[in-house]
Design a protein with these regions (language model features):
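Structural motif
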Residues: 39-54
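Short, acidic, small-residue-rich periplasmic hinge/interaction motif at the N-terminus
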Residues: 44-46, 58-60, 91-94, 108-156
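Short Pro-Gly-centered beta-turn/loop motif in secreted/extracellular proteins
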Residues: 51-55, 77-84
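Hydrophobic beta-strand segments
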Residues: 57-61, 87, 125, 164, ...
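Short, acidic Ser/Thr/Gly-rich low-complexity loop/linker segments typical of extracellular
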Residues: 65-75
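A short, solvent-exposed beta-strand micro-motif common in secreted/extracellular proteins
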Residues: 83-93
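Structured extracytoplasmic
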Residues: 129-303, 309-317, 379-486, 579, ...
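Exposed, low-structure sequence patches enriched in small/polar residues
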Residues: 274-276, 408-867
Length: 867
């Protein structure tokens, strides 16, 4: 595609998902002090009668969901918070034993369990203890397979029609703070925020600092054929931070993405942006160990307690207990899920899920209450951020067919006005199925008070600058700061100053711009755009409907197309190889965009583009005598149409940006660009067609792959190479997902091409199995990028003198080519999650190795924040 297609990127999409994760990391870093270390317990569990080790016994902190299990040799490691004084060891056929623990940070224990006189009787199930675990002839595995076989009839999707009232509450804050931390000078004005915290056992946990709460009340309708769910939001409220500093909508969307709905009947459960294998997935016996640990005859029907543990504690798997009904339905009555301490998961110190099911009028089980607790921390020690999402389901009814009009439109619809004042505390007190805890009740008031304190405003201002790169200045923001200074061979030392308006100036009009100056070429550059929303919403709120006009004069490297990254970013100033072929661009552009609730959108554009070669880039053509004729500028007028369809797409929505959330659904796009000769000074006729698709493929425990497939065709004759498809190259040392990292700028040009890009993330599936290495929590990543194209003779300077000559180096050798008989291919193997945020790839170029000054291999680095 032409080299300027992504030149007019606004800065609204720079950070997106990373911004929300960054906000979380800032709070974690702020709280990271040594005000309470975890207790590390190590020990062995044995049979008191024969001193034989007891494998897969449960070791749990009393009054907590923190638990572990012994290995084949009876050994265990358990990490608990310092306030707990007892642990409980239990195993089927033995009497449970409570052990008191001291305050030492590291403790070793030897525990002897006493066999029960009468082992637990089960209903048609016995659970003899085996020396070594095996799926064969294992009653626990036979039981879980019966649960798997009955999944479809027990899940809510099996109902023809169902409807219920749903209440959601998300709350979080700093937890387990010490008295010393609370009394620090920096918190002198914030004492009203701290709450005394206790656990069920009565042991003091110090102080908590509640920081966020959100509530939502909805009516939900589901039907089986055709499958459809409709959520009508009846009321919602949350603690609001100053919108100058915090994007409340984006923060809410991010927390709701982390604290997702938990469906135990799904094969893969998405949590904290990762997919965990459900203990009742079809493949669960391959990845989990199951044990029958109890029967419960005090409930009707009788229940079996089925304990399960990951075979590999580093994999993305749960551990916990399932309570299965013994009425022939094999439904889940209750479920308690957590994760192992050794799991390859970033920033999550503890994860706890509790699911409770109730029977409906037909004696079938539906989810009654779901609780998800997450404890985030930068390290295993110290305080983190602890949050809980509680969801209750009431007034559950089935068999009531609603008209099609109920299911029409978007799957989630707000039934309340944005500033509805009728949803006051009296309303919530009446409609909440669960009363707020005292510390939760105070959050709404405390956040309002907190924002009146000048020191807190300064802290938020600095945090916003660090995370977004912009400095607040009334109704505008100055930035991004990482573009203030950069350098390149053409401009030399480059200074830039820019900014953008916010919704404090206008919710419908948005402007951004910058000016820059190069001290070597002594030229001014600038960019200015104005966007007006046509649907009385922010221009970045779905569905978008706006008109935008922009003007730009700036430099550009042909073949460097950076999505969502400023090209004068300081870090991108460092490049390998020759890097002196630039363009001066003057672009005037008008755009009209319309999105629909179906996630279909179109973008219409009209642009006038004048480009002048800069540096050592030349535009030259051979005349009839074979002499070079130089061209000092090139002009075109383009009309463009872009179509995009992204079914079931969701966004991290912010004030000045939005970013799509990856899911399993494909994204299709089609772009058409027409060059208009003799229109507004346009000099060429051509038609550029691009068709492509993006999709993420999930492979459960084997990770996931992001795949892009694209085809391009340019129709026209005697088209100079700047208007052909100059393929994306990368001469920086940063690994770029959408570019060819070992291809030089301007190296390959085509007028028809097909390409494929595969990024495969294994989430540590291999490295998690290697002793010692798995302690590093590194993860594997592989990629293959291939592109094949051709260049028709009428557009190839080797066959016609009516187009610009390809570029040559100082020795007169060509450095720009069409493709030969094979595609260009590069592949990489790398490690990600190094220090939790660094990706390093070894990239190898597989062909076209004889072309001058091309790298055959290299190391590339990328920053990637992820859980």
């Amino acid at each position: 595609m032409s080299s300027y297609r992504v030149l007019l990127l606004t800065t609204n999409s720079l950070l997106a998902y990373k911004k929300e994760l960054g906000m979380l990391l800032v709070f974690l870093l702020y709280s990271y002090v040594s005000f309470g270390q975890s207790l590390h317990l190590k020990g062995k569990v044995m049979d008191v009668t024969n001193k034989a080790p007891i494998g897969y016994a449960t070791v749990a902190a009393v009054g907590s969901t923190t638990a572990s299990s012994t290995d084949d040799e009876g050994n265990f490691i358990l990490k608990v918070e310092p306030n707990f004084s007892k642990i409980r060891i239990s195993f089927v056929g033995y009497e449970s034993q409570d052990i008191s623990i001291g305050n030492e940070t590291y403790q070793e224990l030897t525990v002897y369990l006493v066999p029960e006189e009468n082992t637990i009787e089960t209903v048609e199930i016995s659970a003899p203890r085996r020396a070594r675990y095996s799926n064969k002839n294992n009653p626990a595995v036979e039981l879980i397979r019966k649960v798997i076989a009955h999944k479809d009839e027990n899940r809510i999707a099996s109902y023809e029609y169902a409807e219920y009232r749903q209440y959601e509450k998300v709350s979080l804050g700093l937890s387990n703070l010490s008295e010393k931390f609370k009394n620090r000078k920096i918190f002198k004005n914030y004492q009203f925020l701290f709450e005394k915290e206790d656990v069920e056992t009565g042991n003091s946990k110090g102080y908590s600092l509640p920081a966020f709460i959100e509530e939502r009340l909805s009516q939900v309708y589901t039907r089986k054929k055709p499958n459809k769910t409709k959520q009508l939001i009846l009321a919602e409220q949350r603690a609001q931070f100053d919108p100058k500093f915090v994007d409340n909508d984006g923060l809410s969307a991010y927390f709701n993405k982390l604290y997702q709905d938990i469906d135990i009947y799904e094969s893969n459960i998405e949590l904290v942006t990762n997919q965990f294998l459900s203990p009742i997935a079809g493949a669960s016996p391959t990845f989990y160990r199951f044990y029958i640990t109890d029967t419960i005859k005090t409930e009707i029907p009788h229940l079996v307690e089925l304990s399960f543990f990951p075979r590999n504690k580093a994999d993305l798997l749960f551990q916990g207990r399932l309570y299965i009904t013994l009425d022939g339905k094999y439904a889940v009555k209750r479920a308690n899920l957590s994760v192992a301490d050794d799991i390859n998961l970033n920033f999550v110190r503890d994860l706890d899920v509790k699911l409770d099911f109730a029977q409906d009028s037909l004696q079938r089980y539906y989810l009654k209450t779901s609780t998800l607790g997450l404890d985030f921390s930068l390290t295993d020690k110290g305080t983190g951020i602890k949050g809980t999402r509680t969801v209750t389901f009431d007034d559950f009814r089935t068999g009531i067919a609603q008209p099609d009009s109920v299911y029409a439109g978007a799957p989630v619809v707000k039934m309340i006005a944005e500033n509805d004042t009728t949803m006051d505390e009296t309303y919530w007190a009446t409609h909440r199925p669960i009363a707020l805890k005292p510390n939760e009740q105070n959050i709404y008031r405390n956040i309002d008070t907190l924002q009146l304190i000048p020191s807190f405003q300064r802290f938020m201002d600095i945090s916003a600058l660090i995370l977004s790169g912009y400095k607040q200045a009334g109704p505008v923001e100055i930035g991004p700061v990482n573009t203030f200074y950069s350098f390149n061979p053409v401009e030399g030392f480059r200074l830039r100053l820019g900014g953008r308006t916010t919704d404090r100036l206008s919710k419908r009009f948005y402007a951004e711009g910058y000016t820059a100056y190069g001290f070597k070429d002594e030229k001014w550059k600038y960019f200015l755009s104005g966007t007006y929303a046509l649907n009385n919403k922010s221009v970045y709120t779905f569905p978008q409907h706006y008109l935008r006009a922009s003007v730009m004069r700036d430099t550009k490297i042909p073949g460097q197309n950076l999505d969502f990254v400023q090209e004068d970013n300081f870090l991108l100033s460092f490049k390998r190889g020759e890097n002196e072929r630039y363009l001066y661009n003057d672009i005037y552009r008008l755009e009209y965009k319309r999105e629909f609730e179906s996630n279909f959108s179109y973008l219409l554009g009209l642009s006038k583009w004048r480009q002048q070669p800069a540096g050592i880039l030349t535009y030259q053509m051979l005349d009839e005598s074979g002499n070079n004729r130089l061209f000092h500028e090139l002009n075109t007028t383009e009309l463009s149409v872009s179509l995009r369809y992204a079914p079931n797409e969701e966004f991290y929505q912010g004030k000045l940006y939005r970013t799509p959330i990856y899911n399993k659904y494909p994204i299709f796009y089609f772009n058409y660009i027409a060059g208009l000769k003799d229109v507004l000074g346009g000099e060429y006729d051509y038609h550029n067609f691009t068709l492509g698709a993006d999709k993420r493929f999930y492979f459960s425990q084997l990770g996931y792959a992001d795949v892009n497939i694209e085809g391009n065709y340019i129709l026209g004759e005697q088209i100079p190479f700047p208007f052909l498809n100059i393929h994306r190259a990368n001469q920086t040392y940063a690994y770029q997902l959408q570019s060819y990292n070992l291809m030089n700028f301007l190296e390959f040009v085509s007028d028809q091409s097909v390409s494929a890009n595969v990024q495969y993330y294994m989430n540590g599936f291999i490295l998690n199995k290697i002793p010692l290495i798995k302690k590093l929590k590194w993860r594997e990543v592989f990629s293959v990028k291939a592109i094949y194209g051709s260049l028709r003779n009428e557009n190839n300077p080797a066959y016609t003198n009516e187009v610009f000559q390809f570029q040559k180096n100082d020795d007169g050798k060509p450095i720009t080519y069409g493709f030969g008989s094979s595609p260009y291919v590069e592949a990489s193997v790398g490690l990600t999650n190094i220090f939790k945020f660094i990706r390093v790839d070894y990239v190898k170029r597989l062909n076209y190795l004889d072309q001058p000054d091309v790298p055959k291999h290299g190391i590339r680095v990328r920053v990637k924040f992820d859980f």
